[in-house]
Design a protein with these regions (language model features):
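N-terminal glycine-rich anion-binding loops that anchor highly charged ligand groups
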Residues: 21-35
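Zn2+-dependent cytidine deaminase-like catalytic core
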Residues: 31, 36-132, 293
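Short, well-ordered coil/turn segments that N-cap beta-strands
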Residues: 122, 145-146
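Hydrophobic, well-ordered secondary-structure segments
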Residues: 114, 130-134, 176-183
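Active-site beta-strand termini and strand-to-loop segments that position acidic
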Residues: 33, 142-143, 346-348
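Enzymes that bind and transform nitrogen-containing heteroaromatic metabolites
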Residues: 3-25, 60-66, 82, 147-149, ...
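Flexible, polar/acidic helix-loop-strand segments at domain edges
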Residues: 134-145
Length: 353
């Protein structure tokens, strides 16, 4: 078994916590000695023990770690946060070598973990290949803004709604389950006031007791004109209203209103960055999506295409502002979801090696 195989095991461990770690990265670990896997572990939840400590806790006898090799998908931390530093625990356990999937881009770590381990007699090796585990986390600490994904479903003739201002349900069950997974991977979800009025969406992830559900954001000119009987306001979890006017009514402790003279996509991104929100899913509508594309702030586009023809004056998927220049994206994958097809593209410079 090669280093890459053990690292792949660590990746599978990390993925068990998808949607549970909030602004923390997904991290998995595998402890190996004499070609035998002694223990595996991962970071289960935001605020809980880190992957390295979780792995060590699974040993029948702590002495087993002496002389072992630890495979971990992300550089171990060397600072005191919600948890004590992992590097200290790793060194104290007598681990001989740590094989690392990627250096942590967060400036509080960024090479300091490797330095600590080396200074305490632990061999280290960075082999790469785990960057795709934490695309948004890496992007946020490298680019200092959230990773933006634009998502929409459309008919085969490129329309998102039938003519007339009523909701058109386009995709089947498999695509809707896939959307749930996509929401789980994002820390915030944004829609415009029109989408709230026409679709009356929940924008929730159907997982009970999710510790940090995505923040749901509604972009509106006047928050007071929103329909507060909409089902989004009957659910738990944070809701942000981005309005040009102050909210004059009390609509619940989980609703927060931010005001600006005009909420441009750049201002939205700036607000999220200030709150250390690393990922945003823009779910509509047509106008809001056009604004984000026109300002060149979309890093990934997820399109669900269904074999329906809406025709006529039905609303196109992206409608509004013209582009100053053509945006180039690269195909990530195409997936069949029963009768629907999902196409994912990502901006070239955002592709993880």
């Amino acid at each position: 078994v090669q280093d890459r195989d053990y690292m792949q095991m660590a990746v599978q461990e990390a993925l068990k916590a998808q949607g549970m770690t909030w602004t923390n990265p997904l991290v998995g670990a595998v402890l190996v000695k004499d070609g035998q896997v002694l223990a595996t572990g991962y970071h289960h939840q935001f605020g809980k023990e880190h992957a390295e400590v979780n792995t060590l806790s699974h040993l029948a006898d702590p002495k087993q770690a002496r002389g072992a090799t630890l495979y971990v998908t992300l550089e171990p931390c060397s600072h005191y946060g919600k948890q004590p530093p992992c590097c200290k625990k790793v060194a104290e356990a007598g681990i001989k070598k740590v094989v690392i999937g990627q250096v942590d881009p967060h400036q509080i770590v960024a090479g300091k973990g490797i330095k600590y381990l080396k200074s305490h007699g632990v061999q280290t090796e960075v082999i790469g290949g785990t960057e795709s585990l934490n695309v948004a986390y890496n992007f946020f600490y490298q680019q200092e803004r959230p990773f933006v994904t634009l998502k929409y479903a459309m008919s085969i003739d490129g329309k998102i709604n039938a003519a007339g201002k009523r909701r058109t349900l386009l995709t089947g069950d498999a695509a809707q389950v896939d959307v749930q997974k996509l929401r789980l991977q994002n820390q915030a979800i944004l829609i415009g006031a029109n989408t709230l009025r026409i679709d009356n969406p929940l924008l929730t992830v159907r997982i009970k007791n999710l510790p940090h559900p995505p923040i749901r954001i509604v972009l509106t000119k006047d928050a007071n004109r929103l329909d507060f009987t909409s089902q989004i306001f009957k659910t738990r979890g944070q809701i942000w209203l981005l309005s040009e006017t102050n909210l004059t009514q009390n609509v619940g402790e989980n609703v927060c209103c931010y005001t600006a003279s005009k909420w441009t996509p750049q201002k939205v991104i700036q607000l999220l960055a200030e709150h250390e929100i690393q990922s945003l899913l823009v779910e509509g509508g047509s106008n809001v999506q056009a604004q984000f594309i026109a300002t060149d702030l979309v890093d990934e586009i997820v399109t669900y295409i269904t074999p329906l023809v809406l025709g006529g004056t039905a609303l196109p998927a992206v409608y509004g502002q013209a582009l100053a220049e053509i945006s180039h994206y690269q195909l990530l994958d195409v997936k069949s979801l029963n009768q629907d097809v999902r196409i994912r593209v990502r901006r070239k410079e955002c592709l993880q090696e």
